């Protein structure tokens, strides 16, 4: 079942006289339970694509359906409600509230639902245990490491069981061990909960944890790689080869 269907996605910036087309007719379909990475050189449009797919930014033309709902037809208020219920986000900057504990931060998405306290606590325990942060639940963000902050941010994205999670360079601010810890946990949650994840990354190691990698070049899909039954190491080598053909991938914000 397709969770995300994007058809003929166009995104332009500027005026008619000085228009820059960043996305040029992209089609993407993401099935339930897929862990998909979007890669591309700096300026290729990968971050713009994630922002448009996740409704952070408006598209110029095309169709985006999530769980069958046409995102482009939703009014601002409806879109905000849809986003709260169906979408989860993991950003590079963690975005945790300093005045709340780790547990309180993670439970934020449930505070807008009518879920009973006991059920919320059970959900919290499950996801926090999976991500290895249950023991630090009563600490504040300034008392924990960057890797722990990002795992708390990931737990907050998973807690309300969204239809799809969008991750923008989630390992960008982490050292290699913290990054591999986070990616391993995301992979586990993807497999255990059949969570659907779309992640933008410039890092081939991060992309190798995914089941499919979409390469963007000049605002269009250049090619795709499927992991299939390959080992992560073999998939990593395939990603590196494709990246080499693309001419290297720099960090892109």
From Swiss-Prot:
The keyword Transport applies. This is Bacitracin export ATP-binding protein BceA. SUPFAM superfamilies: P-loop containing nucleoside triphosphate hydrolases. Gene3D superfamilies: P-loop containing nucleotide triphosphate hydrolases. PROSITE patterns: ABC_TRANSPORTER_2. ATP binds at residues 40-47. It comes from the Bacteria. Keywords: Antibiotic resistance, ATP-binding, Nucleotide-binding, Transport.
